[in-house]
Structures are given as structure tokens and as C-alpha cells.
A protein has these predicted regions:
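Hydrophobic/aromatic-enriched cytosolic interaction surfaces used to assemble or bind macromolecules
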Residues: 1-339
Length: 339
């Protein structure tokens, strides 16, 4: 989403020397390198020109030592300098805001959006990088002006994220965010001419995206964690229907999803959402059955093996590993045509 070469802004250039050197020979696809406190995930995917996306690598490395030292070892072992590379910003490191598209020329759009969102940010816009993505189907819809997503992140946050890669001589091509990474996964799940809602959950909360035609139409953060669902469980089963506390996390999640989907239907009546897909989590079958009884559309469990090729990566057949790497996989599936 945020293109690395565009980071050569005066405000950021004073903080860090960006060092992007095109490798002599590039491998196909994109590599996402995701740094966590205890591990490093590396995913290499090739999607352009393939009938089904191919996952060539989905590795886990224990994080020992400084970030730059780890990345230097990975660059050497995996020849990362011969790949196009990307990283994901963490939730909380950026803001994504839906705004009315300014009526300006395309090359003036980002500056106009910076001015428009200046009072919506939690930090000064002069200290931020800003990128934009159009929301399809909003041009003149119901008499409303076109809408777009504005993504903003502090220059200091971007600088800190890039620095270990720069120190390790790993060429970053783009910086992405989970909303658009999840869109890339959802693109593989869409029935022809229809949209799909995809819900991922982890111990930081939930992320719902609605996509159609490979484009992101709506996103929403949901304050229900995987841990809270694990700790709840069904209270009882009557007539093959799960009955849970109305104030519990299951019910809160169902209500948030229904409100989000109803809101989407009002905004985009021209887009038919075919189904809700749940990313793999603990107790996914229970959650699927619960939501299927409360939502007005089919609910399915995500199975990446049905839409991607990764036969040689045994670990990725484990649903727990799929959800652990879901957004890294999505970031590696990014194609320029989607932007």
C-alpha cells in the first residue's frame, strides 16, 4: 500500500538513509518478511500469471539477536537481495480513514487528501506519510461523491520499520497493511461477479473485510479476540442450535458482523455478498455453526489449500499456521494491478 520508493520524502530522508538497490536478477513473486517479538515469518508467493497463487515458502525462524543481524542472515541464506520484498505495518502503527475524494487531478490527489484528513489523525499530518486507494462503485452512487481510503503513518514509525531492512541490504519495494493483505486473500475466494466477507481473528481482535472483483470495499476492526472466544464456549445445545450468553463474545461478534454487513448492503446495494469466510481459529466449527444460525448468508471455513498451491509446505496444511501467517501470505500475494 505504501510504496517504499515513495518514502524518499524530505521529512523522512532526514531520519534514515533509504538504500533501495535493484537486484541484478529478480525472482518472480513477492516476499513478505514479518518481524514478531519471538519470531520472523518469511512468505514467498507468486500469483501473477498463475491460475492459482503459488506459495513457494512459508518459514518460521526464531528471533535471536538484533533485527538487522537476523535479517542479514536471512538475506544470505534465502538470497533475499534477489527478491522483491515487502513488510506489514502493525495495527496501531497507522490509521486508515474513509474520506470523500477531493475533486482534483490525479497527481494532486495525495496532497489534497493530506489536507482533508489533517484533523482526523492522532498525529500531525506534516509528520506523516499518506497514501490513498479508491473505493470502487462510489463514483456518483446514490448522488454521493466518490470515496477513498487514506492510509497515514508517522514518518518515525515508517523509519523504524525500514531501518533494519536497510541495514541488512534487503530491498523493500512496498509497505503494506493488514486490511489490504486480507483483501488479497479474499480475492482468491470470490465467486464470479460476487463479493465475499472474510473475518480473521487473533489475540489482538478481529478484522472484517468485504471485497468484490479483487477490490476492498469495506473494512472493520472488531473488539473480540480469539482468546475471549476460546474462554467462552457454548453454554448449552438445544435443538441442534447453540445457545450462548447474549452478553458473551459470540453474541457480540455476531451483532458486530450483522451491523457491518447491513451497513455494507446500504452503501453498496449493487454488490451481492456471497458468503462470510472464517479464517482458521480454535473452535472454528462451533463459531461457524453459531454465526450461520444468526447471519443472513452462508458461513464457511477458510481452507487455503482449496485456492492456493503449497503442496510441499507441510506446515501450511495446519490451520493454526494458516491463521498465523494469513496476512503475511496476503501481503506476498499483492499484485500491482490491484492498486
Amino acid at each position: 500500500m505504501l510504496r517504499a520508493p515513495a518514502l524518499k520524502l524530505p521529512s523522512l530522508g532526514a531520519l534514515i538513509n533509504l538504500n533501495f538497490r535493484a537486484p541484478a536478477r529478480r525472482s518472480a513473486g513477492l516476499v513478505c518478511i514479518n518481524l514478531w517479538p519471538d519470531r520472523v515469518d518469511v512468505v514467498h508467493a507468486v500469483s501473477a500469471g498463475r491460475a492459482r497463487p503459488e506459495i513457494h515458502r512459508c518459514d518460521y525462524y526464531r528471533r535471536i539477536g538484533a533485527e538487522a543481524a537476523i535479517l542479514k542472515r536471512l538475506r544470505k541464506d534465502l538470497q533475499l537481495d534477489r527478491h522483491r520484498c515487502t513488510l506489514l505495518l502493525r495495527t496501531g502503527d497507522y490509521q486508515i480513514i474513509q474520506v470523500e475524494a477531493p475533486n482534483v487531478l490525479p497527481d494532486e490527489m495525495k496532497n489534497a487528501v493530506r489536507w482533508r484528513i489533517r484533523d482526523m489523525l492522532d498525529f500531525p499530518v506534516d509528520d506523516a506519510m499518506v497514501d490513498v486507494a479508491a473505493i470502487p462503485g462510489t463514483e456518483g452512487a446514490a448522488g454521493r461523491p466518490a470515496q477513498l481510503f487514506a492510509v497515514a503513518a508517522r514518518n518515525q514509525v515508517i523509519a523504524a520499520a525500514i531501518k533494519p531492512f536497510n541495514d541488512a541490504d534487503i530491498p523493500l519495494e512496498v509497505i503494506d497493511i493488514p486490511e489490504f493483505a486480507q483483501r488479497n486473500v479474499a480475492r482468491c475466494l470470490e465467486p464470479e461477479g460476487r463479493g465475499v466477507a472474510l473475518l480473521s481473528l487473533d489475540d489482538r481482535g478481529g478484522l472484517l473485510t468485504v471485497t468484490c472483483g479483487g477490490e476492498l470495499y469495506q473494512h472493520r476492526r472488531i473488539d473480540v479476540t480469539m482468546a475471549s472466544l476460546r474462554g467462552a464456549g457454548p453454554e448449552q445445545i438445544e435443538s441442534d442450535e447453540l445457545q450462548l450468553e447474549s452478553e458473551g463474545p459470540y453474541e457480540r461478534l455476531a451483532l458486530e458482523l450483522q451491523r457491518s454487513l447491513d451497513h455494507f448492503d446500504r452503501l453498496f446495494p449493487q454488490v451481492a455478498v456471497a458468503k462470510l469466510v472464517l479464517a482458521p481459529i480454535y473452535g472454528a466449527n462451533t463459531l461457524r455453526d453459531y454465526l450461520a444460525n444468526r447471519l443472513d448468508l452462508p458461513v464457511e471455513l477458510l481452507n487455503l489449500a482449496a485456492v492456493m498451491d503449497f503442496a510441499d509446505i507441510v506446515e501450511l496444511h495446519d490451520p493454526a499456521r494458516q491463521v498465523q501467517c494469513l496476512h503475511a501470505i496476503g501481503a506476498a500475494l499483492r499484485v500491482e494491478a490491484a492498486e
